[in-house]
Amino acid sequence: MKDLPADLRPREKLLARGPAALADAELLALLLRTGLKGQGVLQLAQALLDRFGGLSGLLATDTAELGSVKGLGPAKRAELAAVLEIARRSLASRLAQTPVFDSPQAVKDYLQLQLASKPHEVFAVLFLDTQHRLLAFEELFRGTLNQASVYPREVVKRALALNAAAAILAHNHPSGVAEPSRADEALTQALKAALALVDVRVLDHFVVARGSVVSFAERGLL
């Protein structure tokens, strides 16, 4: 980046004008620090954003998948993984301190970071207290998810163990399409009925794909 005028270099620009003044590629370039032969660091940063669908897509990408990208060695992959974990922990802390419906976008962002990059289907639950603050996020089932593979009694058991008052269901679609299926709707109703028996309310069910999250509640499917 030394070939750029001083006031256009990302680091100098950040120090002079603050991080909000930087484009996504410029922020990423600060993490990457160096580019490749024939490809400057800003070009590499933009190529990564284009490939993975922006910053949210990049942060939701599995570390192993990043290993296939030319120019991302172990050190750079470790730094990106650290940023991802910081984002996860920051969102989890926020959800633990405030009711989830005070920050619905934070819930979606958190689920993107947790589930979007999974190469297989994962069913997870956010267990909430009486104030709808996060008690725990748990991945409970993996594989092809349907009423036969997701056991309501196991979800109920965890809710009771955590003394949860409410729950948000979530699962991913590795296909990249976040549209709920009929099987997803049937599973939701089965879990909703099972949890109601122990006075645990299902507040929502999110379907997560890279770059998008669909809410059952917003669709009127709950």
UniProtKB/Swiss-Prot annotation:
Disulfide-bonded cysteines: none
Binding site for Zn(2+): H171, H173, D184
SUPFAM superfamilies in alphabetical order: JAB1/MPN domain (SSF102712), RuvA domain 2-like (SSF47781)
Cited Pfam families: RadC (PF04002), UPF0758_N (PF20582)
GO molecular function: metal ion binding; metallopeptidase activity
Position of sequence motif JAMM motif: 171-184
Domain of life: Bacteria
InterPro entries linked: MPN, RadC_JAB, RuvA_2-like, UPF0758, UPF0758_CS, UPF0758_N
GO BP annotations, alphabetical order: proteolysis
CDD domains: MPN_DUF2466
Keywords: Hydrolase, Metal-binding, Metalloprotease, Protease, Zinc
MPN domain mapped to chain residues: 100-222
Family, as annotated: Belongs to the UPF0758 family.
The protein's name: UPF0758 protein Mpe_A2695
